[in-house]
Amino acid sequence: MKIIIIGGVAGGATTAARIRRSDETAEIILLEKGKYISYANCGLPYYIGDVIEEREKLFVQTPEAFGVRFRVDVRTENEVIFIDRKKKTVTVRLKSEDTYEESYDKLLISTGASPVRPPLPGIDSTGIFTLRNVADTDRIKAYVNNRPPRRAVVIGAGFIGLEMAENLHALGAQVSIVEMGNQVMAPIDFSMAALVHQHLMEKGVNLYLEQAVASFEQAGKEVKVVFKNGQSILADIVILSIGVRPETTLARAAELTIGEAGGIAVNDYLQTSDESIYAIGDAIEFRHPITGKPWLNYLAGPANRQGRIVADNLLGAQIPYEGAIGTSIAKVFDMTVASTGLPGKRLKQAGIVYASSTTHPASHAGYYPDAMPMSIKITFDPQTGKLYGGQIVGYDGVDKRIDELSLVIKHEGTIYDLMKVEQAYAPPFSSAKDPVAIAGYVAENIILGRVKPVYWRDLRDIELKDVFLLDVRTPDEFALGSLPGAVNIPLDEIRDRIAELPS
């Protein structure tokens, strides 16, 4: 069997390796339009910021080494420009602009996603970059080495945007983040993003939220970023991190079905509308395990998982892909931000009734040195307790807790399962009541009606003069600021001062 794979990063390379491990006779051709395959895409911002000092460490495998190890015909700088489904051939363009045709028995599309670059006036000004691949990285790296930036503007506050903000800050730049929405990091709810906002400002990052860019202007060696409200800021370098969209050019030209979310439509076996053509990675859409609606998921973990599954299916298996729930994590200066499943805002958009709990445990036993605070928000079905999503913002131990929440959600578990998870415990690592268990306990109290939560958004609709607002923080904490009309009775004094509470 002759299998052609279009795209050699993440899913494409994984697929090729898996096919070879399963079948020594298959002819495998890997076509990649860039110079590199199998590189650490997620590590690119850290190379720019000198956290990763050696460029070579970004490459998991060179094309030559990969080809030898797995006996794969790796062809870099070979861009597929057309798929002829009737002839079962692809047309490939070389760096020289010459073209050739290659036939296939089975074809895999792993073309990834392309950065959004809106047609704004001045967007081609010197000093404006996107970051998606090694070539982009090399351009940015050369630019900042040649002209160390004093002021940097990052447009877009997703994962890459915040990682670039941190790394440009590490290079000594005064960083400003411009975001059209009212918060950074869209996968989490506003209440959790507010913690990230505070941390960014503590680090000296300027936040311009709910600001849309109208244009760019060259101002000598600087770039002027002009907002739609007329305000403007200057920068030595601008990073566009507005988002990405599925790279479906080839699929559209081949008249493969494109789904309602804009990705290549695939069935449960990652097969497109052509039975000989499969697709994986950022280019595809699939049904969300919770909502059942098509969605796009731009994460390396699911792409590699899809690569393993599709390799077997290309060889004749029928292994279904279970979908992905978007488990993600990012380092934002000293803070770790993670999410899995669906936040409240997306559940609301999907018309799914939910409840939520927010808890603020420590990363490990408080009496052991260096215990750090974390905030955990979970969303769940208010009747059955089925877990829908989790978000964690903290400094230590965030990664293992988000993975526990992800595992429960993937197995369609409930908040009661959070209470039953048996975590390893020792004071340096956790508490006897682990933060995940505490989140489950509080959610159970909400479901059973033992507590009735009032969420921060509810305060906008409450006449505070008509309620007794009790603030149980310490006097020093209360002095830092409180809601109008709040009465301060520290938690440890409530029993002795119970008479002061209204009946």
Describe the predicted segments one by one:
Residues 1, 21, 283-396, 427, ...:
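Mid-to-C-terminal Rossmann-like scaffold of FAD/NAD(P)H-dependent oxidoreductases
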Residues 1-73, 165-188, 327, 400, ...:
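Beta1-alpha1 glycine-rich phosphate/pyrophosphate-binding loop at the start
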Residues 5-6, 80, 102-112, 155, ...:
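Short hydrophobic core segments
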Residues 18-104, 189-206, 345-346, 438, ...:
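N-terminal Rossmann-like dinucleotide/flavin-binding domain of flavoprotein oxidoreductases
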Residues 59, 151-152, 159-216, 299-303, ...:
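Rossmann-like dinucleotide-binding cores of NAD(P)H-dependent redox enzymes
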Residues 109-171, 206, 266-268, 487-492, ...:
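Glycine-rich dinucleotide-binding loop and its adjacent helix/turn
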Residues 118-120, 458-503:
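Positively charged, proline/Ser/Thr-rich regional signature most characteristic
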Residues 124-148, 224-226, 232-309, 404, ...:
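FAD-site-proximal beta/loop scaffold in flavoenzymes
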